[in-house]
């Protein structure tokens, strides 16, 4: 399935190479603008010369075998419950793809379920698929507000967090970044998100990728190298992005 954005086809001839982006559970895990990550990534890949196909996957669908990047968003606890059985049905495929180097971006609720488990505030335990060495505990208050963080890989990352889950990383992964404004994974260690293989997990909504093109470029490069063995980036004018980032960093919490 090829989507269009703003009336223009995402897929148009350029370098003759195609990247296929899969959006996980858009019906149940698409909140706070997370679908914008897929749209921004498609646009960015197109700017780098790729044809792009965007595919949806919802519970009960046949999981496609020939995708290059996987994106998953956040949702309410009820949405996590709805998808849990199906997520475990495809969990082995997702884990193998992650271990094989497929780039993935998972936000908030799916970030939690890519870990070992999520213990909800109501006492229910939702088992994760154990791609990320982390567990999450439901907190008593929501952590809401603008967030700024520093990453060794991506520089300054800006976004918006809105979660009550408190996530704690194990030794098998690294944090995505260190929080300079906001809370992040939990209220104690100043870490935010997680990195393992080519998987990026984070609590940042907003959407994340329009304001953080370095992460988009990372996902695109990883996918291109994995599929074609090479990546030649185009020079992209990010002047408007930099203005948006500067504005976001000045916003109050």
Question: Which role fits each region the language model picked out?
Answer:
Residues 1-99, 210-253:
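N-terminal beta1-alpha1 cap of cysteine-dependent amidohydrolase-like domains
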Residues 17-19, 152-157, 195-200:
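Beta-strand-turn-beta hairpins that frame and shape the catalytic cleft
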Residues 23, 54, 131, 159-161, ...:
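Conserved beta-strand scaffold positions in the cores of enzyme catalytic domains, especially
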Residues 25-27, 164-166, 206-208:
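Glycine-rich beta-alpha junction loops
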Residues 69-73, 105, 201-203:
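Structural motif
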Residues 77-153:
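Cysteine-nucleophile active-site neighborhood
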Residues 121-192:
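Pocket-forming structural segment of enzyme catalytic cores
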Residues 186-224:
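A glycine-centered loop/beta-turn motif at secondary-structure junctions
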């Amino acid at each position: 399935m090829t989507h269009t954005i703003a009336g223009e086809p995402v897929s148009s001839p350029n370098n003759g190479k195609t990247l296929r982006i899969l959006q996980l559970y858009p019906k149940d895990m698409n909140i706070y603008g997370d679908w914008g990550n897929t749209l921004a990534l498609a646009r960015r890949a197109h700017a780098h010369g790729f044809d792009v196909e965007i595919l949806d996957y919802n519970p009960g669908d046949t999981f496609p075998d020939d995708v290059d990047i996987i994106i998953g968003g956040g949702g309410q606890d009820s949405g996590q419950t709805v998808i849990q059985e199906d997520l475990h049905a495809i969990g082995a495929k997702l884990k193998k793809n992650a271990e094989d180097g497929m780039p993935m971006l998972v936000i908030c609720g799916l970030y939690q379920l890519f870990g070992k488990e999520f213990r909800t505030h109501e006492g229910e335990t939702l088992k994760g698929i154990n791609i990320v060495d982390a567990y999450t505990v439901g907190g008593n208050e929501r952590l809401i507000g603008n967030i700024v963080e520093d990453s060794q890989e991506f520089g300054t990352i800006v976004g918006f967090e809105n979660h009550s889950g408190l996530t704690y990383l194990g030794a098998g992964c690294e944090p995505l970044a260190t929080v300079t404004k906001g809370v992040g994974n939990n209220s104690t260690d100043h870490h935010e998100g997680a990195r393992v293989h080519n998987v990026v997990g984070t609590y940042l909504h907003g959407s994340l990728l329009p304001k953080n093109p370095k992460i988009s470029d990372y996902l695109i490069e990883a996918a291109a190298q994995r599929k074609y063995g090479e990546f030649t980036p185009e020079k992209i004018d990010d002047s408007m992005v930099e203005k948006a980032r500067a504005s976001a960093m000045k916003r109050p919490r």
